[in-house]
Each structure stands twice: as C-alpha cells, then as structure tokens.
C-alpha cells in the first residue's frame, strides 16, 4: 500500500508520516528532503540555482539514503549525514527554487518512484498524490495558515537551539508558498481524491483513517 501525504511546508506532514511509518512498519519517503539534498549539493558545488540543465545533471547523480537511527530517519548524501544541514533556511529556500524546474523534477521522479518497491510506503511531499504516485491507495492533504506554520517552525528551531527570526520565517514561508502553488510544473494542490486536514485536525484521527477502509469525520474531500 502507498499512502501519500501532501501539503505546504510546516503543516505537520513530517510528524504524521514518521508516526505512520513507525506504526505500520512502512518505508518512509520524504520528497522534500530529496529536493533539499539537491539544493544543498548545488550550494556546496556552487551550481547556479537558475541553471536548469546543470541542476538536473546534478540531481541525476545524487547518492541519497534514508536510514532509520535512534528513533528518527537520518538522511545521507554520498555517505555523509546531512540531516541537520538540509534543515537550514538557506537550503529550504534554495530547494523551493530548484523544485520549479521540469528537468530537475524529472531527474528526481524515478528516484522517488523506486521507493514504491517496498511492501508499504508513506510518501511525504508536495506532489506525491498528484504526480509521483497518482494511483496511491490513500491520499491525504495537510494544510494550515502561513502564520500557524511559521509559529511551528519557530518553535522547532528553538527546540534545536537554533536562533530564528519569526518575521523572517513568516515572510519566507509566504514566498515559498507562492512559488510552490504557482509554479507551472507540479504545483502544490490537493489531489482530486485526497482527504483534506487542517493543522488543528486530530492527528490520531488522521492516522486512524489511513489504516482503515473508511474516512473519519475529521477530514473532508478536497
């Protein structure tokens, strides 16, 4: 079974997906992390973030691994743990810019679809239910206001001992939302057959839906 969870940055997708993967014993695909790793590699190699061809060539040759360790999934690039590096605001903004290019998305599409070879998969991203896994058995879309997501992000940074500026975080989220929702290639939107949940919806009810044959009352069709 493939379960897709789409939505904007900071809506709680990662928290839900990890809980579901752990509960069901499924593999986890964090597509946002894949784009962040691509962006990190581009920044490290000083690749022009406006050069679609060079970025796509870089994406085609990335060695990315998701490895469960100590209760969380760590992300490795060419054998190096980059889990913390890809969570910086600089990389997040770069990832949103990289993700608008068709050639980059095409280069990373097969890499993402290869995860479906697992017996069960939880796929977290922006276009998992619309583009990458359009035939997924269960599709969810998590959403929340930019303000709520900025508060969540600010708190996450504080908990990690990272200083953050709330106003800057909010502005960057709004800018990223605009790019994600208005890009020509695979814009952020719910799949027609997805169930929609707000950040305030019960995560337990949402998780329950994914492992049952009938939806709970906490979600609505998009």
Swiss-Prot record:
NCBIfam families: cmk. Keywords: ATP-binding, Cytoplasm, Kinase, Nucleotide-binding, Transferase. GO terms for molecular function: (d)CMP kinase activity; ATP binding; CMP kinase activity; dCMP kinase activity. ATP binds at residues 7-15. SUPFAM superfamilies: P-loop containing nucleoside triphosphate hydrolases (SSF52540). It comes from the Bacteria. GO terms for cellular component: cytosol. Its EC number is 2.7.4.25. The gene is cmk2. This is Cytidylate kinase 2. The keyword Transferase applies. Its main location: cytoplasm. It is found in: Cytoplasm. Gene3D superfamilies: P-loop containing nucleotide triphosphate hydrolases. InterPro entries: Cytidylate_kin, Cytidylate_kinase_dom, P-loop_NTPase. It comes from Haemophilus influenzae (strain ATCC 51907 / DSM 11121 / KW20 / Rd). One of its GO terms (biological process) is nucleobase-containing small molecule interconversion. PANTHER family: CYTIDYLATE KINASE, CYTIDYLATE KINASE/PANTOATE-BETA-ALANINE LIGASE. The keyword Nucleotide-binding applies. It catalyses: CMP + ATP = CDP + ADP; dCMP + ATP = dCDP + ADP.
